[in-house]
């Protein structure tokens, strides 16, 4: 593992870890940063699968007590069964649409200009959702009904468009559908587990020939870095939302998206042939 490969792994691991669970689109940031540091092709596809697993492991670790309680409670406790059912219901739409359209979306939409547009549009929607008065029906994830879960599951599918943000779509969707900010955020974290693991397993099997033994040190470094920074992001976000809205993330999305569009419009960076 040479110095440049290690540096690329660290940079992309940091980006994945910090952005995966913030409502600012990890995929969008990965596409932009990978293009800037010239990390692309088949190796990048395999690497992205690994660092996503690092990020999701951070959430599993952070919520290990809740996961343990749910697993133990499945045979005898109705709240544990309801919570599990809600996760499966919310997960299902992404499975169906992902299998049907993932390749087409990756081929035509995985580029910096699409990311920039989605960042701006998503930021505007986020500002509108935060300023809109909405009645809180659900204070805790255990109080959710199946129809809350299903609606959030459909909204999550919007995140197939790079730049939209999986966490952003599910959190804002949760707010619009009556969840408290804490409940929407926590359910987004829990929903990430089956969604991201499922996507990683599917992609890992589909592109299994891309994994080469020689890449193991670089992939392991990216995995560890992603795990560490995802832990920082998850804990930081849970503390942040206790006293703040998501407006700061909305303004960041808008500013970052406009910056990308400006570099394209004025020819400062050639995004026309960029790919994730």
From Swiss-Prot:
Keyword Chloroplast among UniProt keywords: no
TM helices/strands, residue ranges: 43-63, 85-105, 109-129, 183-203, 214-234, 248-268
Alphabetical keyword list: Antibiotic resistance, Cell inner membrane, Cell membrane, Cell shape, Cell wall biogenesis/degradation, Hydrolase, Membrane, Peptidoglycan synthesis, Transmembrane, Transmembrane helix
Gene Ontology BP terms: cell wall organization; peptidoglycan biosynthetic process; regulation of cell shape; response to antibiotic
Cellular component GO terms, alphabetical: plasma membrane
Domain of life according to the entry: Bacteria
GO MF terms, alphabetically ordered: undecaprenyl-diphosphatase activity
Subcellular location: Cell inner membrane
Entries under Pfam families matching the protein: BacA
Enzyme Commission designation: 3.6.1.27
Record's catalysed reaction(s): di-trans,octa-cis-undecaprenyl diphosphate + H2O = di-trans,octa-cis-undecaprenyl phosphate + phosphate + H(+)
Membrane topology: Multi-pass membrane protein
Keyword NADP carried by entry: no
General remark: Bacitracin is thought to be involved in the inhibition of peptidoglycan synthesis by sequestering undecaprenyl diphosphate, thereby reducing the pool of lipid carrier available.
Function: Catalyzes the dephosphorylation of undecaprenyl diphosphate (UPP). Confers resistance to bacitracin.
UniProt record similarity statement: Belongs to the UppP family.
Cross-referenced NCBIfam families: PRK00281.1-2, PRK00281.1-4, undec_PP_bacA
Protein name (record): Undecaprenyl-diphosphatase
């Amino acid at each position: 593992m040479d110095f440049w490969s290690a540096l690329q792994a660290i940079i992309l691991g940091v980006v994945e870890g910090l952005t995966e669970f913030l409502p600012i689109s990890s995929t969008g940031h990965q596409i932009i940063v990978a293009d800037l540091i010239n990390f692309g092709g088949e190796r990048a596809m395999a690497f992205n699968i690994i660092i996503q697993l690092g990020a999701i492991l951070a959430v599993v670790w952070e919520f290990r007590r809740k996961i343990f309680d749910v697993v133990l409670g499945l045979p005898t406790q109705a709240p544990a069964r309801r919570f599990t059912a809600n996760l499966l219901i919310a997960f299902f739409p992404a499975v169906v649409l992902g299998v049907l359209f993932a390749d087409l979306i990756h081929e035509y939409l995985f580029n910096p200009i699409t990311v920039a547009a989605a960042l701006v549009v998503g930021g505007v929607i986020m500002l509108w959702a935060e300023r809109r008065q909405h009645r809180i029906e659900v204070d805790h994830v255990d109080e959710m009904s199946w129809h809350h879960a299903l609606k959030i599951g459909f909204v999550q599918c919007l995140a197939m468009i790079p730049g939209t943000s999986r966490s952003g779509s599910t959190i804002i969707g949760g707010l619009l559908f009556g969840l408290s900010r804490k409940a929407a955020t926590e359910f987004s974290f829990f929903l990430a587990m089956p969604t991201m693991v499922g996507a990683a397993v599917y992609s890992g099997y589909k592109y299994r020939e891309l994994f080469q033994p020689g890449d193991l040190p670089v992939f392991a470094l990216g995995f560890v870095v992603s795990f560490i920074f995802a832990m920082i992001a998850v804990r930081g976000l849970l503390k942040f939302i206790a006293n703040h809205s998501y407006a700061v993330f909305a303004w960041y999305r808008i500013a970052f998206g406009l910056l990308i569009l400006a570099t394209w419009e004025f020819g400062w960076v050639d995004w026309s042939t960029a790919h994730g």
